[in-house]
Design a protein with these regions (language model features):
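Conserved redox-active cysteine motifs that mediate thiol-disulfide chemistry
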Residues: 73, 81-98
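Hydrophobic membrane-insertion alpha-helices, especially the h-region
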Residues: 12-26
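N-proximal helix/coil linker or "cap" segments that precede and/or mark the start of modular domains
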Residues: 24-56, 195-202
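Short, Lys/Arg-rich N-terminal segment immediately upstream of the first membrane anchor
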Residues: 1-9
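A short beta-strand-turn-helix
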Residues: 56-77
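Thiol/disulfide oxidoreductase modules built on the thioredoxin-like
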Residues: 125-134, 140-190
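Structural microenvironment flanking redox-active thiols in thiol-disulfide oxidoreductases
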Residues: 90-130, 141-148, 198
């Protein structure tokens, strides 16, 4: 008799749980459909109109080893092209270093690529002067990857999702540890299927 009395409550409990799960799934799907909120300095961030695959070109690390974006599979990657002769690059680089310090790990990394023709010696002078501690030095002296991505001005920053698809870019400098920039990066970390709804570009 006691068990019978509790059955309605059990049934309603199941309904409430299923309803909560449905609402949660709706919220997640809605966020992925609408896309990230572009506020503050990220208002000029350009969301990709189509899901473009990552470039296959390579650049070099500080030891001269060839690296491509495929190395960072399953991570959201922020790729920043910078140069020592570019004042906006110099201003924003410390904030990119702080972004890597706060979010870098299994889900996210920053790839900061110098296009200085002087290579490592020139780039390292600025890295040391700015006391950059959390970024790995990458070099693209011939600007091959920058050209493949259609870089038109410096600095330019791209974000790629976990599947290696370009989801957007920002042309010009920004404070990348600003709360709105961090929120943008976290959106792509938390919504790995966002680019699924975009047209595919070969």
């Amino acid at each position: 008799m006691i068990g019978f009395q509790f059955r309605p409550f059990f049934k309603y409990g199941i309904i409430l749980v299923l309803g909560a799960v449905g609402i949660a799934l709706f919220v997640v799907q809605t966020a992925e459909t609408k896309g990230p909120k572009l506020a503050g300095p990220m208002q000029v961030f350009q969301l990709a109109p189509s899901a473009k695959p990552r470039p296959t070109t390579t650049w070099k690390d500080g030891n001269g080893k060839a690296i491509s974006l495929a190395k960072f599979k399953d991570k959201v990657v922020l790729v920043n092209f910078w140069a020592t002769w570019c004042p906006p690059c110099i201003r924003e680089l410390p904030s990119i270093d702080r972004l890597q310090a706060s979010l870098g790990g299994d889900n996210f990394t920053v790839v900061a690529v110098s296009i200085d023709r002087g290579g490592k010696p020139v780039a390292m002078l600025l890295v040391k002067r700015l006391k950059i501690k959390h970024l790995t030095l990458y070099l693209d002296k011939e600007s091959k990857t920058a050209r493949d991505l259609g870089v038109r001005s410096m600095p330019t920053t791209f974000i790629f999702d976990r599947m290696g698809r370009e989801v957007g870019k920002l042309e010009g400098g920004a404070e990348w540890d600003d709360k709105d920039a961090v929120a943008l990066v976290k959106f792509f970390i938390d919504n790995p299927n966002y680019a699924d709804k975009l047209p595919r570009k070969k």
